[in-house]
From Swiss-Prot:
Its main location: membrane. This is Fluoride-specific ion channel FluC. GO terms for cellular component: plasma membrane. The keyword Lyase does not apply. It catalyses: fluoride(in) = fluoride(out). One of its GO terms (biological process) is cellular detoxification of fluoride. The gene is fluC. It is found in: Cell inner membrane. Keywords: Cell inner membrane, Cell membrane, Ion channel, Ion transport, Membrane, Metal-binding, Sodium, Transmembrane, Transmembrane helix, Transport.
């Protein structure tokens, strides 16, 4: 039996638990901001650093595919998908695909925000949860 899905699921459970823990440990006041999503901000930045580090090691075959699936797809995927976004963008830039990288960054942020707004609107107006 192929355990790839189990490795990803186990890593995802660990990453999600870590995300929850970090989010609970962070204060809501940050610098000059009265209310700032510091937990989410922190996991996104930490995740980007870790996936950059691990992504480089993966290209050098420092660890096997199963560990990569467990840690990168599972743990970091559960911790933050923003780290994958950062790695994908870096890979485009490294290949001098600047238009693609800019389109990816702008498109992800703009369409992501639009998606959140539409989802919010639909839940508020059609599901009856105000």
């Amino acid at each position: 039996m192929n355990f790839v899905f189990l490795w990803a699921a186990l890593g995802g459970a660990i990453g999600s638990s870590l995300r929850y823990f970090v989010g609970k440990m962070m204060p809501s006041k940050f610098l000059m901001f009265e209310s700032f999503p510091l937990g989410t901000f922190s996991v996104n930045i930490i995740g980007c650093f870790v996936i950059g580090f691990m992504g480089h090691l993966a290209t050098k075959k420092v660890f096997g595919d199963d560990f990569g699936i467990f840690f990168v797809t599972g743990v970091l995927g559960g911790f933050t998908t923003f780290s994958s976004y950062g790695l994908d963008t870096l890979k485009l830039l490294q290949k001098s695909q600047y238009i693609e990288a800019i389109s990816y960054v702008l498109g992800t942020n703009l369409l992501g925000l639009i998606g959140v707004a539409i989802g919010w609107f639909l839940a508020k107006n059609f599901v009856g949860v105000h």
